[in-house]
Amino acid sequence: MNAGYIPYSAWVHTPEGGGRIVGESCHIFDLFRFLVGRPVVSVSVDALAPETESARPDDNAVITVLYEDGSMGTLLYTSIGTKNAEKETMKVFCDEQLFELHDYKELKTYGASADLSLKKQDKGHFRELQAFAECMVNEERFPIPWEELKETWEITRQVADCVRTEK
């Protein structure tokens, strides 16, 4: 994730804001879990050792999550890239195929049958709210099991603690 620089005086960097790792990467860990479909067995974090105040470890880290089936998800989160480039690019490698997602607008496939291009970005917020409302109205369980939500939070908390101690 090429998050771009946000001044360290901004609210997101306050204790109440939680930091960008908490505020953004948690969604990526949740997406990893959805794609892999297996529990996490370990998490490793390597944060930037900065030389200037404009590049801090809590905004610049590589996080690798290892799953029960041997799959792994790696997030490169950085604030030192240019905002002129894509913010979010994901590559999924599996079964001799490659899926590239660009800013949640375009999906390119290699070794698979179809590409997808949207006119606007779709991170699924609207559909998530619809699903939540349907669960409430119909008194159904939420589609994401509690254990998976808790696991995502535990990963996020562990990563946040690691990048804070790297300073």
What spans do the regions from the language model cover?
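C-terminal helix-rich "cap/oligomerization" subdomain common to oxidoreductases
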Residues: 68, 132-167
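Predominantly a Rossmann-like dinucleotide-binding segment in NAD(P)-dependent oxidoreductases
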Residues: 1-54, 166
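Acidic/polar loop patches that form or flank catalytic/metal-binding clefts of enzymes
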Residues: 41-44, 72-73, 98-100, 142-143
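Conserved glycosyltransferase catalytic-site signature
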Residues: 25, 29, 57-61, 146, ...
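Short beta-strand scaffold segments in enzyme catalytic cores
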Residues: 63-65
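A general structural signal for well-ordered alpha-helical segments in protein cores
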Residues: 28-29, 126-130, 156
